[in-house]
Curated annotation (Swiss-Prot):
This is Large ribosomal subunit protein bL21. Keywords: Ribonucleoprotein, Ribosomal protein, RNA-binding, rRNA-binding. NCBIfam families: L21. GO terms for cellular component: cytoplasm; ribonucleoprotein complex; ribosome. Belongs to the bacterial ribosomal protein bL21 family. GO terms for biological process: translation. PANTHER family: 50S RIBOSOMAL PROTEIN L21, LARGE RIBOSOMAL SUBUNIT PROTEIN BL21M. This protein binds to 23S rRNA in the presence of protein L20. It comes from the Bacteria. Pfam families: Ribosomal_L21p (PF00829).
């Protein structure tokens, strides 16, 4: 069984047991979360497509922990004026494991 879920503007295709990296959420490692915006649920025999969401469908997941992404360097430069600014950013992510898909 698989599902397509939407989480804060991004869509993911998930299956039970899959480890997924999503944008940071405020949840403790080891806790259970529910992702309620299920757009599609399918298996070998049938596919349920929501309009826009599948009624009563929920994806449950376990929070594994947090991690940071690669550093993005932003460099601003203006010629002939000695103007240079260098800043960096590291996005924080949450790693989750999909426990079950309830449709």
């Amino acid at each position: 069984m698989y599902a397509i879920i939407r989480d804060r503007g991004m869509q993911y295709r998930v299956e039970p047991g899959q480890v997924l990296t999503i944008d940071l959420i405020s949840a403790e490692p080891g806790s259970q979360i529910e992702l309620g915006e299920v757009l599609l649920v399918g298996d070998a025999e049938q596919v349920k497509v929501g309009s826009p969401l599948v009624e009563g469908a929920v994806v449950r997941a376990e929070v594994l922990g947090e991690q940071k992404g690669d550093k993005i360097v932003v460099f601003r430069y203006r010629n002939k004026t000695r103007y240079r600014r260098r800043t960096g950013h590291r996005q924080r992510y949450t790693k989750i494991r999909i426990s079950e898909i309830v449709a």
